[in-house]
């Protein structure tokens, strides 16, 4: 009987972990671009006036410049302060091109608002620029 209980608990824990993992990704999300251009402002979150500056502006320069920047308002994942500093692996659904980005801001477009440099690296066929947005998948990853 004790063995059955342990198996039930293990099964429950595995299912919960899978549910959490599934909630940390989304498909066919709209991604627009924003002119953060962090390389022009020494990756200064305060100068960029981004939401996450309150918590992350004093992080080391290497941390701030390691990944491209994005605003996050996607349909799945943490919001507000809980999303700040987290990383996403973003995939252009049209080309398969991938980039890892760091969340530094919020948005209201229901998806991502990528730094223009990241957007351009993902937009390898130029269709996103023509449309003004990309269709992407994203998943939260460790930074």
UniProtKB/Swiss-Prot annotation:
PROSITE patterns per the UniProt record, alphabetical: BARWIN_1, BARWIN_2, BARWIN_3
CDD domains reported for this sequence: DPBB_barwin-like
UniProt name for this protein: Pathogenesis-related protein P2
Location(s) in or outside the cell: Secreted, Cell wall
GO BP annotation list: defense response to bacterium; defense response to fungus
Signal peptide: 1-23
Keywords of this entry: Cell wall, Disulfide bond, Pathogenesis-related protein, Plant defense, Secreted, Signal
Barwin domain sequence ranges: 24-143
Keyword Signal: yes
Source organism: Solanum lycopersicum (Tomato)
GO cellular component: extracellular region
Expression triggers: By infection with Cladosporium fulvum.
């Amino acid at each position: 009987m004790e063995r059955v209980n342990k198996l039930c608990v293990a099964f429950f824990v595995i299912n919960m972990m899978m549910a959490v993992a599934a909630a940390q990704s989304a498909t066919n999300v709209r991604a627009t671009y924003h002119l953060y251009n962090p390389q022009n402002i020494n990756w200064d979150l305060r100068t960029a006036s981004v939401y996450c500056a309150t918590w992350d502006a004093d992080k080391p320069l290497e941390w701030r410049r390691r990944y491209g920047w994005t605003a996050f308002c996607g349909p799945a994942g943490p919001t507000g302060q809980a999303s700040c500093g987290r990383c996403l692996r973003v995939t252009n659904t049209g080309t398969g091109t991938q980039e890892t980005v760091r969340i530094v801001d919020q948005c209201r477009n229901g998806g991502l608002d990528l730094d223009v440099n990241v957007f351009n690296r993902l937009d390898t066929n130029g269709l996103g620029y023509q449309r003004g947005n990309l269709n992407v998948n994203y998943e939260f990853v460790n930074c």
